[in-house]
Regions:
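Mid-to-C-terminal alpha-helical segments outside catalytic/metal-binding sites
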Residues: 2-17, 27-55, 69-93, 286-300, ...
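Catalytic pocket-lining loop regions of alpha/beta-barrel enzymes
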Residues: 30-36, 172-301
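Active-site gating/metal-coordination segments in enzymes
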Residues: 34, 42-47, 97-197
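Alpha-helical scaffolding within the catalytic cores
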Residues: 38-42, 66-71, 97-106, 133-138, ...
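Acidic (Asp/Glu)-rich catalytic clusters
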Residues: 46-48, 72-77, 102-113, 137-146, ...
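Short, well-ordered coil/turn segments that N-cap beta-strands
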Residues: 50-53, 79-82, 111-117, 146-149, ...
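Acidic-and-aromatic substrate-binding clefts and catalytic sites of carbohydrate-active enzymes
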Residues: 60-68, 89-100, 124-133, 199-208, ...
Length: 350
């Protein structure tokens, strides 16, 4: 039974509840300054506890299946600072006409200090079967300030090791980066000032088209996912630390995320260890380490979690921290959270 005292407690609490900050208003417009304050407080709290937070700039999920409460608890347990958790529009949603999934809005209502509002993943079927409608919807959301960065666009994507094992060939994607869709994405980044991510397999024949797009859209902020992840080494003779060094010097708005497998990770179709940053016995190759040390502001932490591996967040966290600990302390902090902070807010973290 509700007593008079219970009612009094409830009514007394109402003014306090009404004053709680709301990161998303009635028009679904995200309050970026308010989010920024909450993000900074969370990062500083983890740092004050003597732990290293990082900003996961690249993870995704199925918004209909993901257990957000579980993810948030794991972030607290593992001292993960922030996560850009993108919603992938699957076949079911696509067939219902969904072209923008507002997962970020829901995340910010429940956990405004943990999640970065991000656009949807550009992958099949939306990017391959309805690219214009998909990009129209992403642009509307971007202009309404419903996100801080665009999602990950799969221009060239081999099936992942997990997809290969289960015979899923639907993610063998080829969308010309210099085609109409690529031009729209690069242009959208320039016009909105928002960064976007590309999944772009490393092959010699794919490098020149990317370079031309970077030249044509110098203000586009591009995060090339999976540094030095080469599935077939025989197809990638040009891609070396020296080549990446040259790209960094030529293109000031090009970034790289550090989501890659561990030293033992093998790509089944080629039977090759595809995370090329690692030496044979598990240490970072000196030439890749030196490159990161030389340009730490251009490298970002990332886990690359997906719906089929969200339950492995602890494993992915451990592997990413194993990479981070091999960097000098100041560089470690830069890559872990400072680089992403600068990219999102155009200022140094302080």
């Amino acid at each position: 039974m509700i007593t008079r005292r219970d009612l009094l407690k409830t009514f007394c609490a109402l003014p306090f509840i009404a004053c709680l900050p709301r990161p998303v208003n009635a028009q679904n417009i995200v309050d970026f300054p308010q989010l920024k304050t909450g993000y900074a407080q969370r990062l500083k709290k983890i740092l004050a506890a003597g732990e290293l937070p990082y900003i996961d700039i690249e993870s995704s999920c199925n918004s209909m299946k993901a257990d957000i409460d579980s993810i948030a608890k794991s972030m607290d347990r593992l001292n993960i600072g922030l996560m850009a958790l993108s919603a992938d529009i699957g076949k079911g949603q696509f067939e219902k006409g969904v072209r923008f999934d507002n997962l970020s809005e829901k995340l910010l209502v429940s956990y405004p200090d943990r999640f970065i509002p991000v656009g949807n993943g550009g992958q099949p079927p939306v990017l391959t079967e309805a690219p214009d409608a998909f990009l129209d919807a992403q642009e509307v959301a971007a202009r309404k300030k419903q996100m801080m960065l665009l999602g990950e666009f799969e221009f060239r994507h081999y099936p992942s090791p997990r997809q290969v094992k289960r015979g899923d060939t639907g993610r063998d994607v080829r969308v010309p980066i210099d085609g109409p869709t690529g031009h729209r994405v690069f242009s959208l980044s320039e016009r909105t000032g928002m960064a976007f991510q590309i999944h772009y397999e490393i092959e010699d024949e794919l490098l020149t088209p990317l370079e031309k797009m970077l030249e044509q859209y110098p203000k586009a902020k591009v995060i090339w996912c999976h540094l030095a992840q080469i599935r077939y080494i025989e197809r990638a003779s040009r891609y070396t630390p020296a080549y990446v060094d040259a790209l960094i010097k030529r293109f000031p708005n090009l970034y790289f995320d550090t989501a890659f497998g561990d030293a033992a990770s093998t790509y089944p179709p080629s039977n090759q260890r595809h995370a090329r940053v690692w030496a044979a016995f598990g240490g970072l190759k000196s030439e890749w380490r030196d490159l990161i040390v030389a340009y730490p502001k251009r490298f970002l932490s990332a886990l690359d979690l997906g719906q089929d591996r969200l339950e492995r967040i602890t494993e992915y966290d451990q592997k990413h921290r194993d990479f981070l600990k091999r960097l000098p302390t100041d560089i470690r902090h830069q890559v872990a959270y400072r680089s992403a902070w600068s990219l999102l807010f155009s200022e140094d973290f302080s």
